[in-house]
Amino acid sequence: MGRIYVAVFAALVMSTAFFPGAASANPAIAKRYLADVQKVGDGVLTYLFWDVYRATLYAPAAGWRRDAPFVLSLAYLRDLKGADIAGRTIAEIRDQGFTDKARLADWSDRLTALFPDVADGDSLTAVRDEAGRTIFYRGAGRIGIVDDAEFTRRF
């Protein structure tokens, strides 16, 4: 996860006290990939006055590390276009200082093809696996993979 996402997620984790009922989006996926899984935190991302999604982060009981497997699940609270989700993801990676235009374009193409439009109640889940790949799910169904450790590190 990139610095921006870590900062956003840290704020979400701190907001758990304010959103104790924030449901986990898909704990079954976390259990498939993580031994002795634990929920690290959850919270709601709000942009201006719109609630966008509930995020839940899962890691092994030993704790979250960016270089080890983890699962980040987002339960959407509004309708969004998949292309907009992909575009925002690439913008965040670019804002981290990543400037390789060819790789950004490749990642943008992959994510735009991969991310579906979402509606209130849909969930998207990203898994950072042992090999450093990012595996994406919509609900319980796998929708694709980005097999690029640099992408995974920045995502």
Which role does the model predict for each range below?
Residues 23-155:
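Terminal leader/tail segments of proteins
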Residues 7-17:
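Bacterial N-terminal signal peptides
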Residues 1-4:
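Positively charged n-region of N-terminal signal peptides that target proteins for export
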